[in-house]
Regions:
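Membrane-embedded alpha-helical segments of integral membrane proteins
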Residues: 1-40
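Glycine/tyrosine- and acidic-biased, solvent-exposed loop/turn segments at the edges of beta-strands
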Residues: 16-19, 65-342
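Short low-polarity hydrophobic stretches
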Residues: 23-30, 56-62, 190, 262
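Transmembrane-cytosolic junction motif
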Residues: 35-43, 72-76
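Internal/C-terminal transmembrane anchor helices
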Residues: 45-73
């Protein structure tokens, strides 16, 4: 298909001529009102002046019509936008929430109160047991439903702006960032989907730094296998999470429903640390419980030292630069792999 412009050159020529005619009509009217000589000249040559004026009016009608159409379109857009952003004048129950007067809504379909995308409340409102001043409506895939690639089940997700820390499903969420909940069983049940944690959360005996993000996550592999993890915690940037005396930075922890740590990866040692007889330098990568490692060495950690640095065994001395050491928390060494093998 050969692309063609929406408006041809002829259209713009006609539009330009019509615009000049409209300007001429306006200037002529102004001159007739302000200057007596112009009025006398118009009366002296009434027939010719009237014909020219009429011709200019007809010629200018095209641009006048275009302006009128544009103004009407703009008015329609403003009207539709206003209909998409109503403010409640009385209390209404929407999305299972009692919304007070003054609530400002954003709708995806004008006039359809069931198509809410956002809501801003004049004061804190109880949203499924959580005090919130605003919400955004979305969807999330239900990873607890039976897997069906042709028809993935979805859940209604509400992203809430809260007024202070809130404890949900055992996690204390902060208010510096929105938290997200999902509605299950026809909105009879609400569960936490994700939030940034406040102070006071603990995992495996360690304090999770405030600002870390917790989210619902179940690891699924390409072959269809699914792990038993239920939560994922991404430790706050530049903060340290202490796990079994290991000072971990950048850790991504995978937990089961009871918050037992099943696996973590992408972690590095924030400072030098020792396990059994081996001392590892800061920056050493630490992995636990990932697929492949857990089958061959259940419960073991894998340490990979940074390039040009090495771990030191107090009995045998330095271990080769960049080597990987598979070691139990008790200190038992299962294997040492040279280089940076996976």
């Amino acid at each position: 298909m050969i692309p063609a412009p929406i408006f041809s050159g002829t259209f713009f020529i006609v539009l330009g001529i019509s615009f000049l005619a409209a300007v001429s009509v306006v200037l002529w009217i102004v001159a007739l009102v302000l200057f007596p000589p112009v009025r006398r000249s118009f009366r002296a040559y009434r027939r010719r002046s009237t014909a020219i004026f009429a011709a200019l009016c007809v010629t200018s009608s095209f641009v006048v019509a275009m302006v009128a159409i544009g103004l009407q379109a703009e008015a329609n857009i403003r009207k539709e936008e206003a209909a998409k952003h109503p403010a409640l004048v009385k209390s209404e129950r929407l999305l299972g929430i009692d919304m007070p007067p003054g609530t400002r809504l954003s709708l995806s379909t004008a006039g359809d109160m069931n198509s809410i995308e956002k809501a801003e409340f004049p004061h804190a409102v109880d949203v499924y047991g959580i005090a919130a001043v605003a919400l955004t409506v979305g969807t999330e895939f239900d990873d607890e439903a039976p897997r069906n690639d042709r028809d993935l089940a979805t859940l209604t997700a509400l992203t809430l702006t809260t007024t202070g820390p809130r404890t949900i499903d055992g996690w204390t969420c902060g208010s510096k960032a929105p938290l997200k909940i999902v509605l299950r069983n026809d909105a009879r049940t609400r569960t936490l989907w994700s939030c940034h944690l406040a102070d006071g959360n603990r995992v495996a005996g360690g304090v999770v730094p405030a600002g870390s993000r917790v989210m619902r996550s179940t690891t699924t592999y390409g072959d269809g296998m699914r792990d038993n993890d239920y939560w994922e915690i991404r430790v706050a940037e530049d903060d340290v999470f202490e796990l079994s005396s290991l000072p971990l930075r950048h850790a991504e922890l995978r937990l089961d429903r009871e918050r037992t740590v099943l696996a973590f990866d992408y972690a590095t040692l924030a400072r030098a640390a020792s396990v059994g007889n081996i001392a590892y330098p800061a920056g050493t990568e630490v992995t636990f419980g990932v697929r492949g490692l857990r089958e061959d060495y259940p419960g073991a950690w894998r340490f990979r030292t940074p390039g040009r640095q090495h771990a030191v065994d107090k009995n045998t001395g330095p271990i080769a630069d960049g080597a990987s050491v598979v070691q139990a928390p008790s200190g038992k060494v299962y294997a040492i792999f040279p280089g940076r093998t996976d």
